[in-house]
């Protein structure tokens, strides 16, 4: 299934207050524009986000090179440089570890409103797990600044979960 946004760009940009806008992963608007219309089309999408949130609050997301995607990282790095935004390393993690794949698949099927069998085509060949620092460095080796930027963003967004007292299940990460 197609994902429908819960909030629109206008409402989010009006909220302001230090929101950070990631451009999205492989299925996000920037990558869709890049695949459909090339770098110029992707730049237009990036410009819309910069106009809405400001260049300091827009982060060009790069999930790392898998297969023949090295050139995509170069294009994204150049888009970030040219727009004055930052390239950030991400992994698109959906699960904490490979042992949680079955649970992650069930949650994805639920989100899609389909059975597990029907959702199989949407789960992708690369299941996404949290990666170690060494794995992230290997995945994003061509763009070490993206790793540094991701660490800075994570530090600025970090907070103590005990402050909101959620009842989360204990899990090993």
Q: Positions of the model-derived regions?
A:
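Phosphodiester-processing cores and adjacent nucleic acid-binding clamps
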Residues: 1-173
């Amino acid at each position: 299934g197609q994902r429908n946004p819960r909030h629109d760009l206008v409402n989010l940009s009006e909220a302001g207050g230090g929101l950070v806008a990631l451009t999205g992963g492989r299925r996000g608007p920037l990558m869709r524009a890049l695949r459909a219309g090339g770098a110029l089309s992707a730049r237009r999408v990036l410009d819309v986000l910069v106009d809405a949130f400001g260049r300091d609050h827009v982060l060009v997301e790069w999930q790392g090179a898998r297969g023949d995607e090295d050139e995509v990282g170069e294009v994204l790095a150049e888009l970030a440089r040219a727009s004055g935004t930052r390239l950030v390393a991400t992994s698109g993690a959906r699960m904490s570890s490979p042992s949680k794949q079955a649970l992650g698949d069930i949650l994805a099927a639920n989100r899609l409103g389909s059975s597990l069998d029907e959702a199989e085509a949407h789960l992708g060949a690369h299941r996404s797990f949290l990666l170690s620092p060494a794995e992230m460095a290997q995945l994003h080796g061509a763009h070490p600044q993206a790793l540094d930027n991701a660490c800075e963003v994570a530090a600025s967004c970090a907070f103590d979960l005990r402050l909101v007292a959620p009842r989360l299940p204990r899990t090993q990460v």
